[in-house]
């Protein structure tokens, strides 16, 4: 008898319940012919071009992001997963705020207290430890001074410890007249610039730590099947037979192949009025006045922290692997990228702070933006439309001008790279009914290209 991999009981129970409901529904409607929605997309006049001059130069503030992956040598195919992550393009909706390395070894930061004390973790304790990796991540952040390095990058810290505002000026899109403002300046414009950076730029700095693993589908599929059988045994005869047949169908469909599971932990830097005041008072210096004591204080200090907001999980099914190693590597690589994209989309949907702004690329003939399935867009999702303005002090403000809704079945499928053949979860080629490279919205009026949209609950 094959030993089952540990999986979450709640997950199995949810799937089992779904099978029972589906089984009953199929039984009740077996004689009915399936009705397909034949609504077709109307042809839009003209293709929206992302390089159009009206939108190509749009500048808007993005959140900043540092991405990492956890190394676990015990996992199969980990070399392919790590290589894929390190070679993947950086998410284009964020500023690249990479510091440190892109990965760390899980077992270098495992809690060894129990081992030193001669204690053995119970199976339950080990399972809980494997399920939540935030203690190891937190230890890595503390040992490597990741939060300090994030702040150092924001203020363009040099080897001598001097800071400047060049990166804040660049990402804040302040005009040339603001670039000569020193931190010590008491001008209203200088104060506004610093306050603006503190309110929007630095606090919207995140770290996402990924843990991806390559697993066989069969143990999980078998566990779901067995649990369904056990639950069905308590039901009346006809219902029992229907549920078991539904479980068999699902098992046979999902048992072959593999899946890439990704868990992503989302952290945010703790920049606020208090930390800002301490930074400028105790650590700030420029090239005109180097203070070795301040330099050392910043490097050894623990003022800055990364706060865990939460985590999300996503998986991508691999129905089968190719006959040669090259095909296998490519399949695993694509599945890994898709699982990472999926978990980022879940993080944005779950955590409002992590949501990105996207410019409208067109309002006529259609209201459209360059986001799609890769970002987790769904039918009926609502987005607020924001107009960004800059006041006389250079502070950027956002004013809501309306709310728009994603049009049904008009979502850009950007999960596939240009030239890549679209396939379903079983690896079968599929034909996309909606082939335009933008998502269409409806609602409101008076918008213009360049306005920003952001998802709302």
Give, region by region, the residue ranges found by the protein language model.
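Hydrophobic alpha-helical elements and their junctions with loops/disorder across both membrane
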Residues: 24-25, 346
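Surface-exposed, polar/charged interaction patches used for macromolecular assembly or partner binding
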Residues: 31-457
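Sec/Tat signal peptide C-region and signal peptidase I cleavage site
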Residues: 26-30
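Long, contiguous C-terminal modules that act as interaction/assembly or targeting platforms
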Residues: 1-4, 457
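Bacterial N-terminal signal peptides
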Residues: 15-23
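Bacterial N-terminal signal peptides that target proteins for export
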Residues: 3-16
């Amino acid at each position: 008898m094959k030993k089952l991999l540990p999986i979450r009981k709640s997950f199995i129970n949810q799937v089992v319940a779904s099978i029972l409901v589906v089984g009953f529904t199929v039984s009740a409607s077996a004689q009915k012919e399936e009705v397909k929605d034949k609504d077709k997309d109307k042809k839009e006049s003209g293709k929206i071009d992302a390089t159009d001059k009206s939108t190509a130069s749009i500048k808007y503030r993005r959140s900043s992001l540092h991405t990492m992956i956890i190394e676990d040598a015990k996992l199969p195919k980990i070399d392919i997963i790590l290589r894929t992550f390190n070679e993947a393009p950086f998410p284009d909706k964020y500023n690249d705020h990479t510091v440190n390395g892109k990965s760390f070894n899980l077992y270098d930061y495992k809690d060894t207290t129990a081992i030193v004390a001669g204690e053995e973790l119970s199976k339950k304790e080990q399972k809980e430890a494997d399920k939540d990796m935030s203690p190891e991540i937190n230890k890595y952040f503390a040992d490597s001074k990741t939060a300090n390095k994030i702040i150092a990058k924001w203020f363009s810290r040099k080897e001598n410890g001097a800071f400047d505002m060049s990166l804040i000026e660049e990402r804040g899109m302040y005009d040339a007249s603001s670039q000569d403002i020193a931190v010590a300046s008491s001008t209203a414009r200088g104060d506004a610039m610093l306050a603006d950076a503190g309110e929007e730029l630095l606090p919207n700095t995140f770290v996402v730590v990924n843990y991806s693993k390559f697993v066989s589908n069969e143990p999980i599929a078998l566990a779901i099947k067995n649990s369904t059988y056990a639950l069905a045994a308590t039901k009346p005869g006809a219902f029992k037979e229907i549920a078991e047949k539904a479980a068999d169908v699902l098992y046979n469909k999902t048992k072959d192949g593999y899946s890439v599971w990704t868990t992503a932990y989302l952290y945010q830097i703790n920049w606020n009025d208090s930390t800002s005041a301490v930074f400028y008072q105790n650590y700030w210096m420029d090239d005109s006045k180097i203070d070795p004591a301040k330099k050392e204080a910043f490097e050894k200090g623990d003022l800055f922290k990364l706060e865990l907001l939460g985590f999300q999980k996503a998986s991508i099914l691999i129905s089968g692997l190719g006959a040669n190693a090259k095909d296998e590597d490519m399949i695993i690589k694509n599945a890994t990228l898709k699982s990472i994209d999926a978990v980022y989309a879940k993080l944005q949907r779950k955590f409002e702070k992590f949501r990105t702004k996207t410019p409208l690329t067109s309002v006529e003939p259609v209201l459209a933006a360059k986001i799609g399935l890769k970002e987790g867009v769904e039918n009926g999702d609502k987005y607020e439309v924001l107009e960004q303005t800059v006041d006389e002090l250079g502070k950027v403000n956002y004013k809501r001008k309306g709310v728009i809704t994603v049009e049904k079945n008009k979502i850009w499928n950007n999960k596939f790279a240009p030239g890549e053949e679209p396939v379903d979860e079983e690896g079968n080629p599929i034909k996309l009914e909606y082939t335009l490279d933008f998502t269409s919205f409806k609602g409101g009026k008076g918008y213009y290209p360049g306005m920003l949209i952001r998802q709302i609950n």
